[in-house]
């Protein structure tokens, strides 16, 4: 740590738990689909849907730097950020940078679409078996087939987005010297002296929003 740097807590526990739990659930979803472990696939899908809804709520009501209005900048700002990716400079971000902010939105949108379409999927032609989602029989066959095709297509875009996300993290570490993984593990980041720590929301609020998201998913599936 240099003399003019200080450790600042930038990521709250709810964001960090969301991030790492989501990684495990996405891996579990792919593995369970490939192996045909459908009960497990359903559970992981429900959990992903709940977590994504929670993160959307947290993006409006959660910690200061987790809110969309805090880290979402213009597309032009994101392009300028990417244009400086080869330039080694000092990391001053207390949230996602402009490009990273848009990647968060893209990943959330893809995960939401993937999990929602899976509820109604009837047959995935990309695999060697046939299986329907828990709500597939609640809609007509044409709708189920359309959502099945969407479920398969979004899977490819999701894998691409994840690969780009990991590549960007590696480039920021190796080229720019910015450490992005450890702050998401510990919550703390080494920033220039005088950097302002973001206001972090309470764990009780996070728990309440998580319960709300879970209840919404449960009621939708039961009452659809």
Regions from the language model: what does each represent?
Residues 1-224:
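Membrane-embedded alpha-helical bundles that constitute the cytochrome b-like, heme-associated redox core
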